[in-house]
Amino acid sequence: GNAAAKDILTSYSIAEFFSHLPEIEREIEVVTYIAGEGDISTDLLSPGNQAHSRADRELHAKCMISEKAQSEIKELQKKNPDKKVMLIAEKGTMGVGSSRMSGINNVALLTGKKVSPYIPFVNYAPIVAGTNGISPIFLTTVSVTGGIGINLKNWSKKLDSKGKPILNNDGNPILEQNYSVETGTLLIINTREKKLYDKKTGKELIDLSDTFTPQKVEFMKAGGSYAIVFGKKLQSQACSILNIPLKKVYADSKEIVLPTKGLTAVEKIFNSNLIDKKHNRKLYAGSDARVRVNIVGSQDT
């Protein structure tokens, strides 16, 4: 056969396109920007009444939050050219709602990195955070862009002597501030220690183990989860063509095994198409696995 083609396939079979990428930075310095108080809807980041402009990324980005907010973010970037802006939902959850992809695209365009100097208006690796974390489905979309989503836990409920929340006159829990993230605060994300630090005092603020799981770090390293998905597909295909075993390159998959429980129809489809079957164990919902794709379905389109 063709020697050059075999060299390429051999490289693909050990996923050199991924393993040769540089690791993510050890420390990421950020400057905070409070996008709003309470839960932040994706409609604030990508308004539904401007949906007609979503195909034009440059135009659609102009409707994120407000012109005033965009000017303030750009001013922060001018004052802190070596730092990334962290968009925050103070006392709430970031990214509730359904316009998640266009929403995170707008955040990335304003605060992320350029994918390429030759591709205009496509950025990646935004950093978003919320006092109560990130909405689960929005967090998945953050991973699509190779971004970072942080549960700040910078406010907590004030408790009485019995450990029960103290309520105000409106019946809502009284909150106590654990640390401040007011606009302009300088923080350091240490990706190796998986900690968040106050840059000014050096004080450790929170643990970030949930933010930097092995799988999420891979998404950040590759520039997004799609790159990992397609990379695994390339590796599997190359190994199949060369008729060699699949070499471990990526982080271990999460496996959920419930020996006494039956399988749903969807679980049966996935199990019958597993590429790397181990000990004939059946995997259940919540597992990560490589599968052969031979069916396409759609949820709502």
Q: What spans do the regions from the language model cover?
A:
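Fe-S-dependent hydro-lyases/dehydratases of central metabolism
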Residues: 1-301
